[in-house]
């Protein structure tokens, strides 16, 4: 959420004080941290933010997580008639709700509240604010909320989803729809957690366009308020407006870029153990923007004989190309 406060005196004094605060659903970049990397006897490279207790050569580097800002806001125009511009930092549609709070003697064009959809990577002039009576003082707070995706999108896949796994090996579904540990909110109720070793290739379950990503987080834990927004992930937009999220990816474990078209079965990254997590696994969920709320939707995977199945906790699964 973005919140801006402004107050003005009569226009003859041409005075306005602005206090800006950026409060996003997703946090801004974290401070730089030390990353240790080493290659074990099996040839697997590990990344950690704790110094490893090993005799193997360890490399040390500094990394700063990328900003995860979905929206930037800037002001132009004179103090007595500020114009607010909004830029979508993702490569998919972004819905923005704009509203006025604590407003006195203020008029806006267009009238607020309102919901606007910013196209991928676009910037638009959305709101102009001014005093209703220019002879009197005025004040307001401009508040915004952002939700990825186009409101009203309907999930309508043409075929079951491909399991987001490499074609060899079996993997255990540790948590499925409505899982008690963490699948208990609208955004992740219809999600699956698939246990897999760190560094396992993650494949696109459905074709689409990479909308957003994060790749520089390196730690995990169970403090939801801290770790909940610190997972590496890829968000892919589908042709029906739904979006798939592949989360808890490894440090620097994203191999696609925003705006890139990906095909079903393409490798998009490596599994990991970042963010709100108790162990290495892949979190997979399909979401839509429903009335300015991210809501997960039920889906089916393709089984070994081409049949569709609903994921269940405890089932061992294999991908089929």
Predicted segment positions?
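N-terminal secretory signal peptides that target proteins for export/translocation
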Residues: 1-13
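Short, cationic interaction patches enriched in Lys/Arg with P/S/T/G and frequent prolines
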Residues: 2, 29-85, 89-125, 130, ...
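Acidic, glycine-rich catalytic/binding loops that coordinate metals and/or anionic ligands
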Residues: 156-177, 203, 226-229, 254-263, ...
């Amino acid at each position: 959420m973005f919140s801006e406060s402004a107050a003005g005196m009569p226009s003859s004094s041409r005075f306005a004080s602005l206090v800006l605060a950026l409060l996003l659903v997703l946090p801004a970049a974290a401070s730089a941290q030390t990353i240790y990397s080493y290659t074990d006897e099996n040839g697997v490279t590990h990344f950690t933010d704790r110094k490893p207790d090993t005799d193997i050569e360890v490399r040390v580097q500094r990394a700063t997580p990328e900003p995860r800002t979905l929206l930037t806001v800037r002001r132009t125009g004179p103090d007595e008639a500020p114009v607010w511009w909004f830029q979508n930092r993702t490569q998919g549609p972004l819905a923005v709700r704009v509203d006025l709070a604590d407003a006195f003697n203020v008029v806006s064009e267009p009238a607020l509240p309102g919901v606007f959809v910013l196209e991928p990577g676009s910037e638009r002039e959305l709101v102009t604010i001014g005093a209703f009576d220019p002879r009197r003082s005025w004040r307001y707070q401009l508040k915004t909320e952002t939700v990825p995706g186009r409101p009203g999108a309907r999930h309508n896949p043409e075929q079951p989803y491909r399991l987001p796994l490499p074609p060899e090996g079996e993997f255990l579904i540790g948590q499925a729809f409505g899982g008690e540990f963490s699948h208990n909110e609208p955004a992740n109720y219809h999600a699956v957690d698939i246990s897999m070793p760190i560094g396992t290739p993650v494949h696109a379950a459905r074709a689409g366009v990479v909308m957003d990503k994060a790749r520089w987080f390196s730690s995990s834990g169970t403090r939801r308020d801290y770790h909940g927004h610190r997972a590496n992930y890829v968000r892919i937009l589908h042709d029906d407006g739904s979006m798939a999220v592949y989360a808890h990816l490894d440090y620097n474990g994203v191999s696609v870029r925003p705006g890139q078209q990906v095909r079903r079965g393409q490798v998009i990254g490596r599994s990991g153990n970042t963010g709100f997590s108790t162990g290495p696994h892949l979190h997979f969920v399909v979401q839509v923007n429903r009335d300015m709320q991210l809501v997960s939707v039920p889906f089916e995977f393709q089984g070994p004989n081409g049949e569709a199945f609903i994921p269940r906790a405890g089932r061992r699964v294999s991908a089929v190309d």
